[in-house]
Amino acid sequence: MDMAFVEVCLRMLLVFVLSWTIFHVNNRKKKKATKLADLATEERKEGGPDVIIVGAGVGGSALAYALAKDGRRVHVIERDMREPVRMMGEFMQPGGRLMLSKLGLQDCLEEIDAQKSTGIRLFKDGKETVACFPVDTNFPYEPSGRFFHNGRFVQRLRQKASSLPNVRLEEGTVRSLIEEKGVVKGVTYKNSSGEETTSFAPLTVVCDGCHSNLRRSLNDNNAEVTAYEIGYISRNCRLEQPDKLHLIMAKPSFAMLYQVSSTDVRCNFELLSKNLPSVSNGEMTSFVRNSIAPQVPLKLRKTFLKGLDEGSHIKITQAKRIPATLSRKKGVIVLGDAFNMRHPVIASGMMVLLSDILILSRLLKPLGNLGDENKVSEVMKSFYALRKPMSATVNTLGNSFWQVLIASTDEAKEAMRQGCFDYLSSGGFRTSGLMALIGGMNPRPLSLFYHLFVISLSSIGQLLSPFPTPLRVWHSLRLLDLSLKMLVPHLKAEGIGQMLSPTNAAAYRKSYMAATVV
């Protein structure tokens, strides 16, 4: 009986302790939430920011400038304010330059020794062709791109953004987002002094690149690593045609050379395997000399090897694919490589990003209160639809072009690869049309489908000649299947209606590519 009494007492004590603990924890959470809300209100009263931007790369800096020009108070938090040393983001397509000018940032390409680009010089099996960006009366800007050192461009953008009095650019590492009832209210970050602090704003924009630590908590779009880009700089040299991106259809994938300054040439190539040769013990250098360099045309080989001979630092970067999805949470927007990525072979990431910033800044401009979650949600739905002509065209083209460039012993795949080279070599409407798509001068998914369809038919024609045999017919059917496998996933991911609507493409061109702002 005594034992039973003791057991009852122990159970009552346990229930009391658990109840008190739960009450105490909930009370602390409520107090913390109240404290955060009070801090946010106090910060707003003291002239706190309207928008917090995580990351001051190309996207964060450009967005800060655009929003600040519209009168918003912007707090930008960047992990490292030193000049970045990157291998990606070194080529701005003509369409990207147009977007940059629409944002009032075209002068950021000046004073960084940027080099003019007029097109692509393509090499395959000892043959070469040149494909130039077309002079298009419907494209209201100079039909040329720019090569440059990414870090110099980013620093110019940061300077431009911080020149506005309502932009606060701060070095710090964002640790986490501050949430209240599923709504993001601000961020917790460690400043340059090592102190952990907070910043609150009605709207937070995550724009911290492909290695974003915050993306996983906001979106379901996991990054897929498709390949590895390896590159280095050859210094004190100049290409024979510095205004061309030199693209070599090598094995297992492609190699590139382009002039990033008046004296520097970027050399890079792609590997598909995860088991990469080691850079530290010299395996990578030997691999480049023995396997990649012999495939580079003789006229380019000396420049390609110069960087290796002089011990240039070899960088390795992952090529990733991330489908675009809207954030599950309110009070926050994800942009840039944290939001959407495609294979970098057509160098279009910055172009899509600047297009996104132009669309988003115009949609947000009429909103008096960025804390109105419902209105911001409606803006984001509109943004997601309006960006499709540019983003869907570029995503599909980038990923498809990359798949075509991969070398293969499969006859159907090799026929498609040869067909692409022949198509760009043919001149006329074929070359100009495809180059307009690559350059972001004509963001129309329907036009892209047309060109991919014609490339497929031309490749099938080559496979069947001089006369069809059962084996050639079989390879032709497989080639057609390969073409569909490249396109169908993008149709599903981007939305069939959005991809096939000529009205959406026309509206995008009128609103965001017209000679005068509509």
UniProtKB/Swiss-Prot annotation:
Coiled coil: none
Membrane topology annotation: Multi-pass membrane protein
Root EC class: oxidoreductase
Database matches in InterPro entries: FAD-dep_OxRdtase, FAD/NAD-bd_sf, Squalene_epoxidase, Squalene_monox
Cofactors demanded by this protein: FAD
Molecular function in Gene Ontology: flavin adenine dinucleotide binding; squalene monooxygenase activity
Span of the signal peptide: none
Chain residues that bind FAD: 58-59, 78-79, 86, 91, 158, 174, 337, 350
EC number: 1.14.14.17
Gene Ontology biological process: sterol biosynthetic process
Transmembrane domains' residue ranges: 3-23, 48-68, 448-468
Keyword list, A-Z: FAD, Flavoprotein, Membrane, Oxidoreductase, Transmembrane, Transmembrane helix
UniProt pathway: Terpene metabolism; lanosterol biosynthesis; lanosterol from farnesyl diphosphate: step 2/3
Reaction catalyzed: squalene + reduced [NADPH--hemoprotein reductase] + O2 = (S)-2,3-epoxysqualene + oxidized [NADPH--hemoprotein reductase] + H2O + H(+)
Location relative to the cell: Membrane
One Gene Ontology cellular component: membrane
Highest taxon above the source species: Eukaryota
Similarity remark: Belongs to the squalene monooxygenase family.
Protein purpose: Catalyzes the stereospecific oxidation of squalene to (S)-2,3-epoxysqualene, and is considered to be a rate-limiting enzyme in steroid biosynthesis.
Protein name: Squalene monooxygenase 1,2
Lineage: Eukaryota, Viridiplantae, Streptophyta, Embryophyta, Tracheophyta
